[in-house]
Amino acid sequence: NSIHDMDREKLFEKFLEDCKNRKEWCGQGNPNADILIIGQESTDISEEALIRNIMLCRDKKDRDAPRPIDPKNKTWANYQELLDEIYCRKSEYIDKWDFEKFAFTTELSSTPRKQRNYKEAKPSIKERIVFFKDSDFIQDFSVIILACGGYIKNDDKVREIDNTFHVEFCKEYGSKESKNRFWTHIDKKDPRKLVIHTRQFSNGISKDLIKEMASVIREHLRKLGLI
């Protein structure tokens, strides 16, 4: 059986068990969404936070519920803007983010930035990339946004994105001088999957990048009959 024929909830339960055993952040949002966003790192991954995170993911009623807006969290504000652009909508709430109904989010590093430097975290990031490569849950999304900058790369020597997500580079968007660029990748054998690599969605991301990326994703989802 193709993994696409399996129940996503079953794939998700296996992913949660694996994260629990590895003592890693699993993520949050709607595991049955069409869009997966992989950021750089979580802010709090104490043992208590990891346990709370898994409990929340198993709570089907609350796991993708609207969350109060945190003015300091620029990343989530930009995720909300992207999902609103993709689905041509606006949040139903003045004081809450509700993008998690439309996406699942997780992180490429399971060590908070404040506790280490990139060099120290690199081995665990590499292990997590292998974990994602082998995860049927991660691979099952129609759109995967790698919003984690240089934590994963494709260059002349290393084709981490291609190898991890079974895709090939397709097109570059944005100006070469700008930090606001993104790259698309597709699986030529199964064009159902679109992988986008870009910078972190924190401070400095442009409205133009969000709009252009949303347009590319919307067109992909339309082709698949998902919008």
Regions found by a protein language model. Give the residues of each.
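Structural motif
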Residues: 37, 145, 195-197
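Active-site and ligand/interface coordination hotspots across diverse enzymes
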Residues: 1-75, 128-135, 181-189, 222-227
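Acidic, metal/cofactor-coordinating or nucleic-acid-engaging core segments within structured domains
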Residues: 65-96
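C-terminal capping/extension of enzyme domains
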Residues: 1-16, 120-133, 155-227
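Proline-aspartate-enriched helix->loop->beta-strand connector
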Residues: 133-150
